[in-house]
């Protein structure tokens, strides 16, 4: 496996969410699907995709909405925990989350208006 390089998201065209600890870009506002989620540390946002993260091994986890298989995500810049990606949802009503990403609001620097 080769070296991974950070992706820089163009802030002139999009509102960028970044890691509060190191400033690494993680996602843009146009990739946000919902602000109505709960993470390990409180409020969380659901995104269609993110960049500059490392994925952990898949793990089964009981969550507020049932049992899921998830991969924890860490920031590529500082290795801080930032959220998780949904690999599998066992409940049919939760399957829309598969492939989507949760980012913890407590670790995000949000776009400034």
Name every feature range the model reports, one short phrase each.
Residues 1-113:
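N-terminal pre-domain and mature-chain start segments
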